[in-house]
């Protein structure tokens, strides 16, 4: 299904060619939704950008474009506003025809990308022997949303979890457990994640204070890297214990992801160093192998290198990231690789990507993107922590959201005098609580910090998950009240747009595909949230002003079709955010 924006763009390109010649066939006419609805539905800003090139006034250029523009049955006669904006008002009859096409489309008119690409989205990436905390929330749900958007656009998406499952910390932990709890190194389920975290902290304290223990820990690392069967088995047990706990979180959040941890790339690290050395990129600095890069300096202004091999011969995150990048390009054959991490890692990835380009690891046809995000803050404006100052565990944060959602639901049921089953209450509380956390995060521009507030995210008014879920449930109540089966509504029935609020709703429904394309380009999920929120508001205005069940035919069926299309659009949009819908709330 061709979107209105695409159709208008094609018409304007044809007009540009007619007015100014074939060399203008590649120029973007810059068609966007109108900034002020009173002037129209869409506007083209091309006349202003062509003024210098053509040496004419923008309004004169705009008039020449209009003189050569044929909109067929799509829009009214265009008008010129301000310095040269071309405004177009879409005809209600055209809107109705397009809405019917969207109604009959299983994808609701969402277009597939062209070309289809192999894309890797690297997100979540917790560390073994540590619990997932609030800091993992944003990477996990932003990465999942981006993957869902790319998938609905038809791309081949590989979701990768680059878990921290390798390094000195394992030698430290294994050495410590061998002393205090050797069963944990031979028996599955001997520890839960809480025990593992406690032992890790104790091992770290011992490592920092005891030089002899440091040597023991390093020997364990050497044995692990050499493939010693006993040490490797202990490492696998520790990884599996953490992995089970991670999966509990992923199940709660409905996250599908393929684990490929740092250890996977360990056999490739030596070759990465050789490759960088062969290309003359390595320089020794204080015994470490480094790559010096343009544009990176420390606070004193001295060159800041990327260390790829430590002075003791060990490797680090940068080495692993370079090996992972090469593997993803050569073996996974990715054409686009997206890294979703906090903004604090922006400098690291900028260095890694620059080294990879210098080493010719990244071909010109492969796009590498870092998607940074800001902090989650408490209502005091500081980084979100517990009252004692420790990092909040993600599981605790999610559980508390469900508890708050249940309290709100039970209060509302009491006020309404409704009796519901325990299964209903538990299910609605779970969906609303988890959805509220997700939506509160995704509705923010990811580059910004945001304030985490259960009260705000669980509110039934405003740009929140409960408001969206309630809008969907309200439409389902219409079908129950009128005993309507939306799926069996007359397929050939026409959509009739008469009232201003139903015209506005119809126009907005047709922007779905454009919004999803925009999110793919910008990787900003909040744009989809904004669209769904505005759609919900437009539906509510339509419902308040346009009788549905009490209307006479054919208006009754037409308005029911608009209700159905709105519900399906909300359901699809929320699913791309990882949020399920509720038939009743």
Swiss-Prot record:
Keyword Membrane: no
InterPro entries: aa-tRNA-synth_I_CS, Arg-tRNA-ligase, Arg-tRNA-synth_N, Arg-tRNA-synth_N_sf, ArgRS_core, DALR_anticod-bd, Rossmann-like_a/b/a_fold, tRNAsynth_Ia_anticodon-bd
Subunit structure: Monomer.
PROSITE patterns according to UniProt: AA_TRNA_LIGASE_I
Ranges spanned by the short sequence motif 'HIGH' region, renumbered to the chain: 126-136
Membership in a protein family: Belongs to the class-I aminoacyl-tRNA synthetase family.
Keywords, comma-separated and alphabetical: Aminoacyl-tRNA synthetase, ATP-binding, Cytoplasm, Ligase, Nucleotide-binding, Protein biosynthesis
EC numbers on record: 6.1.1.19
GO CC, one annotated term: cytoplasm
Name the record gives this protein: Arginine--tRNA ligase
HAMAP family: Arg_tRNA_synth
Subcellular location, principal: cytoplasm
GO molecular function annotation: arginine-tRNA ligase activity; ATP binding
Subcellular location: Cytoplasm
Reaction(s) this enzyme catalyzes, per UniProt: tRNA(Arg) + L-arginine + ATP = L-arginyl-tRNA(Arg) + AMP + diphosphate
GO biological process: arginyl-tRNA aminoacylation
Keyword Zinc applies: no
One Pfam family this sequence matches: DALR_1
UniProt superkingdom: Bacteria
């Amino acid at each position: 299904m061709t979107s209105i924006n695409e159709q208008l763009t094609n018409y304007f390109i044809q007009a540009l060619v007619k007015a100014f010649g074939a060399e203008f066939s590649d120029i973007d006419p810059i068609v966007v939704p109108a900034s002020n609805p009173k002037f129209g539905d869409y506007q083209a800003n091309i006349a202003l950008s062509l003024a210098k090139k053509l040496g004419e006034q923008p309004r004169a250029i705009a008039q020449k474009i209009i003189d050569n523009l044929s909109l067929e049955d799509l829009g009214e006669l265009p008008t010129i506003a301000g310095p040269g904006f071309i405004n177009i008002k879409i005809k209600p009859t055209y809107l109705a025809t397009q809405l019917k096409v969207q109604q009959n489309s299983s994808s609701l008119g969402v277009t597939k990308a062209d070309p289809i690409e192999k894309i890797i989205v690297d997100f979540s990436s917790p560390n073994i022997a540590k619990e997932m905390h609030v800091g993992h929330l944003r990477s996990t749900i932003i990465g999942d949303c981006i993957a869902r958007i790319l998938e609905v656009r038809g791309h081949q998406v590989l979701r990768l979890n680059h878990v921290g499952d390798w390094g000195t910390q394992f030698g430290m932990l294994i050495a410590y457990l061998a002393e205090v709890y050797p069963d944990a190194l031979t028996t599955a389920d001997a520890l839960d994640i809480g025990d593992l975290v406690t032992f890790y902290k104790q091992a770290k304290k011992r490592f920092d204070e005891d030089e002899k223990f440091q040597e023991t820990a390093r020997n364990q690392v050497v044995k692990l890297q050499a493939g010693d069967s006993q040490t490797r088995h202990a490492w696998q047990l520790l990884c599996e214990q953490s992995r089970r706990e991670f999966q509990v979180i992923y199940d709660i959040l409905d996250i599908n992801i393929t684990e490929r941890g740092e250890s996977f790339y360990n056999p490739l690290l030596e070759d990465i160093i050789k490759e960088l050395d062969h290309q003359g990129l390595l320089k020794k600095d204080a015994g470490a192998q480094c790559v010096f890069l343009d544009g990176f300096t420390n606070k004193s202004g001295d060159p800041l290198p990327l260390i790829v091999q430590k002075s003791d011969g060990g490797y680090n995150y940068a080495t692993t990231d370079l090996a992972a990048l090469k593997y993803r390009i050569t073996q996974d054959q990715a054409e686009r690789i997206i890294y979703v991490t906090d903004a604090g890692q922006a400098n690291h990835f900028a260095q890694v990507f620059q080294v990879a380009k210098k080493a010719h690891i990244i071909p010109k046809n492969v796009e590498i993107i870092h998607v940074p995000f800001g902090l989650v803050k408490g209502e005091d404006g500081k980084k979100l922590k517990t009252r004692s100052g420790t990092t909040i565990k993600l599981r605790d944060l999610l559980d508390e959201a469900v508890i708050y959602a249940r309290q709100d639901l039970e209060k509302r049921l009491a006020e309404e005098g409704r009796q519901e089953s325990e299964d209903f209450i538990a299910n609605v509380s779970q969906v609303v609580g988890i959805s509220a956390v997700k939506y509160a995060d995704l509705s923010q521009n990811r580059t910004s910090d945001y304030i985490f507030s259960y009260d705000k995210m669980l509110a039934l008014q405003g740009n929140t998950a409960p408001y969206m879920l309630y809008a969907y449930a309200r439409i389902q109540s219409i079908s129950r009240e009128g005993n309507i089966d939306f799926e069996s509504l007359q397929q050939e029935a026409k959509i009739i747009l008469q009232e201003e609020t139903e015209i506005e709703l119809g126009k907005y429904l047709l922007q779905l595909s454009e919004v999803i394309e925009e999110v793919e380009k910008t990787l900003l999920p909040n744009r989809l949230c904004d669209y769904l929120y505005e759609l919900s508001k437009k539906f509510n205005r339509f419902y308040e002003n346009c009788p549905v069940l009490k209307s006479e035919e054919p208006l009754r069926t037409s308005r029911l079709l608009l209700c159905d299309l709105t519900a399906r659009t909300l359901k699809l949009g929320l699913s791309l955010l990882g949020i399920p819908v509720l038939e009743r709330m």
